[in-house]
C-alpha cells in the first residue's frame, strides 16, 4: 500500500529517478493556515547539503502545491504536493541492472515485481521518496500546532558515537541550529569525524534518533487494535532502513522489578500525571497527556564503494558489485526528519479520530 492513515490520510507516489515524488493528503479541515514556506521549511531541514557526505545529490526541493490550498488556507479538499527530481544521474545504475545490491530492496522488488521494477537510485524504495512524507508532515505539524502539540527529534547515536548526557526538550529543539541536531557538542564533533572517515573509505554508518512529542492530549489511541504505540511503530517502520524501535525507558524497563518500573501517579496542575514518565506517555495503548518519546535505529546505507558479492539474475551466476555512484554516508539525519513527519501524521490522524479536530467544519469554528 502507498496510503497511510484513516482520517488524516496520505498517499505518496514517485521513484528516486522519476520526474517527481509527491503526496496527496486527505482529511485536512478547511481554514488551516498553510503556506509554501511551511512546506519549504520542513524540506530544507531534510537536506543537510552543508555536509556533502550526507547528501551529495542535494536536490533543490523545488515543489508545487497543486490543490487544496487557496489564499494561504486549506480548503478542506485533497492537498496535492509534487516535488521535482532535478539531479538524478541514472547512468550510474546501468551496470547494476539485474544485479541486486546487497542490503537494498533490489532483490525483494525483483522477486515481487519481476523485471518491471525501477532499480535506479533504489526506485520506489529510495530514501528520496521520504521527501513526500516530509511535505505531508509539514501539514500535519501545522494541524497539531492548533492543539499545542510540538514534535521534534534529534540524533542520539551515529557510527557508534553516542550521546550520553541528559537533556531537555528545549535543548533538543535548539540542537537544530548545529551542523547536525545533536545536543552534546563533544559527541557531535566525533560524529562529524566518523562521517568524514567513512566517506573517505567509501563506507557508511548507521545510528539512532529520538523523537519527542510534547503537548499530546490524553485519550489518543485505542485499547487493543489501533494502540497509539503500535501505529507509531508501524509509521516508523514505513521509513527505509529502520531496524529497531525502543519506547520510553525501553529495554531498561525489562531489567527492573515492577516496583521500580511502575510510575507513581501524582497531581500536577490540577490533573493526574506521572512522576517520571518512564513509559513514554502511553498506558494501555492510549496517551495520558505526558510527553511521548521513543528511539528508532537505522542500518548503514547499503550502497558503499567496496566490492560486494551478489548474483547476476539474467545469467543466474555469482557476480561482484562495486558501486561508483553517489550515496549518503548515513541515512540517519534525513531519516530523522521523515520520522518526525510520520509521527506528526499519526498523531494528526488520531486527533481527527478522537474528534479533537473536526473535518466537517472550518477550524475557525472551534470544537475544543
Swiss-Prot record:
FMN binds at residues 124-126, 284, 299-303, 326. Pathway: Metabolic intermediate biosynthesis; chorismate biosynthesis; chorismate from D-erythrose 4-phosphate and phosphoenolpyruvate: step 7/7. Pfam families: Chorismate_synt. Keywords: Amino-acid biosynthesis, Aromatic amino acid biosynthesis, FAD, Flavoprotein, FMN, Lyase, NADP. It is an enzyme of class 4 (lyase). GO terms for cellular component: cytosol. Gene3D superfamilies: Chorismate synthase AroC. It comes from the Archaea. NADP(+) binds at residue 46. CDD domains: Chorismate_synthase. Reduced FMN (FMNH(2)). SUPFAM superfamilies: Chorismate synthase, AroC (SSF103263). Its cofactor is FMNH2. NCBIfam families: aroC, PRK05382.1. Belongs to the chorismate synthase family. This is Chorismate synthase. It comes from Pyrobaculum aerophilum (strain ATCC 51768 / DSM 7523 / JCM 9630 / CIP 104966 / NBRC 100827 / IM2).
